[in-house]
């Protein structure tokens, strides 16, 4: 009986292990980079939402900066995290290759890539209110409801992306899901520390550059 062909972008939602098995021998491709870029854009949009209402950024500026800087940051983060997880997996007795790790990080973020479409739709309907942590009192009830639904959907899709990545690491590393979750958490901690270190170096070499690029939280 012939095996049903795999459709990675669709099947990864509910059959991640099979998807990552099928991708195990595939080289890194344009889809991996596009998914990483989409994840970076989504993260930048989420950061802009933490800015205070007195920043006076327009929707066009927010979307433009997110598409430009977020896409680059997403792809750079893909390679950074792939190197980290590749080394952690090897130390834990895993058997993955770098392309396999990249596939897990990229295709495991498909739900987050889907959240980007929700961000865009919310921005079109709600305007600048979509990027304010606390809506103004004069914002219409429908817009407030839309913003709450957008936040809830983002959190749920983020959690599902984490689940997919953990299951992916379990599959490619040949380890139990619990151990794969510990590997994922440790990798995130190391990735944060490395990113912080790199940010300090960039700030020392190019003062003020990151303040211009990265959205800053303002209470």
Residue spans for each PLM region:
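Short helix-terminus and kink motifs of transmembrane alpha helices
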Residues: 14, 78-86, 90, 99, ...
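Membrane-helix interface segments in multi-pass membrane proteins
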Residues: 43-73, 119-155, 195-219
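N-terminal juxtamembrane cytosolic/stromal segments of multi-pass membrane proteins
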Residues: 1-56
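Transmembrane alpha-helical segments of multi-pass membrane transport proteins and ion-pumping complexes
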Residues: 44, 48, 78, 82, ...
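Interfacial aromatic "cap" segments that immediately flank transmembrane helices
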Residues: 28-35, 96-118, 147-154, 160-194
């Amino acid at each position: 009986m012939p095996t049903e062909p795999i459709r990675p972008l669709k099947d990864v939602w509910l059959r991640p292990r099979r998807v990552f098995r099928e991708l195990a021998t595939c080289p890194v491709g344009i889809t991996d980079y596009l998914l990483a870029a989409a994840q970076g854009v989504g993260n930048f949009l989420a950061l802009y939402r933490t800015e205070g209402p007195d920043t006076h950024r327009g929707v066009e500026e927010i979307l433009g900066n997110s598409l430009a800087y977020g896409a680059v940051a997403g792809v750079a983060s893909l390679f950074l995290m792939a190197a980290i997880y590749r080394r952690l997996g090897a130390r834990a007795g895993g058997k993955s290759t770098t392309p396999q790790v990249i596939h897990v990080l990229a295709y495991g973020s498909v739900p987050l890539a889907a959240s980007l479409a929700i961000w865009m739709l919310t921005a079109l309907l709600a305007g600048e209110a979509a990027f304010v942590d606390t809506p103004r009192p004069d914002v219409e009830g429908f817009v407030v409801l839309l913003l709450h639904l957008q936040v809830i959907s983002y959190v749920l899709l983020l959690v599902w992306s984490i689940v997919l990545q953990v299951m992916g690491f379990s599959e490619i590393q040949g380890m139990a899901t619990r151990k794969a979750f510990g590997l994922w958490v440790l990798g995130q901690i190391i990735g944060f520390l490395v990113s912080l270190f790199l940010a300090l170096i960039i700030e020392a070499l190019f003062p003020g550059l990151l303040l211009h690029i990265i959205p800053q939280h303002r209470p």
